[in-house]
Amino acid sequence: MNKIFDYILSLIYPPKCVFCGKVIDKSDICSECEKTLPYTKGDSVYQKFLFVDKCISPLYYKDYVRRAVLRFKFSGCSCYSRRLGAIMSECAENNLDCGSIDMISCIPLSKKRLHDRGYNQAELLAREISKAVDVKFVPTLKKIKNNTAQSTIKDAKLRAKNVVGVYTVTDPETVKGKHILLVDDVVTTGSTVSECARMLKKAGAKAVYCITLARRED
């Protein structure tokens, strides 16, 4: 019965590539996008930000990647987390020593934004990576102050100032002496991940790594 229902559902809502929207058979990504997405390569996978030991991103934030992220965040496409998380998981396994990571966490949303959106896209990605690399997911941070959306601020110094005092560690004992992988969807100036890493290290974390789906192209 379930198979019949799934078949009917697939006729009404055929699977589409999460990036270009092309109707496909079973996968979440079409063969063309799989080959031509703006992947980071070599040293461009890595970025260094204050308080972050290593930050990696498999894709550049442009074209179909940018559109997919916007749909994922603002159009209720939470199902995208499976494919986007798989891309990030592969990047983590290729560029980090996942066996040394004690926990995976994410950048938190404010209560209002979480309520309005219905989910935290960074948490969905973090949980996908957690399953793929077999490292537990732990929500270590909480947003305690509403601030102006970082995406509306262009100046790097103002972005850094905008996130100071916005986050707190929920349980310092949990992070003390730990190696933590912090997850977010996109990194631009690095202000948010830097501030979250600062708070985690202030609470006693030994190392904080970061992975995002995409990064700004320099």
State what each model feature region is:
Residues 1-218:
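Glycine-rich phosphate/pyrophosphate-handling loop used in enzymes and phosphotransfer proteins
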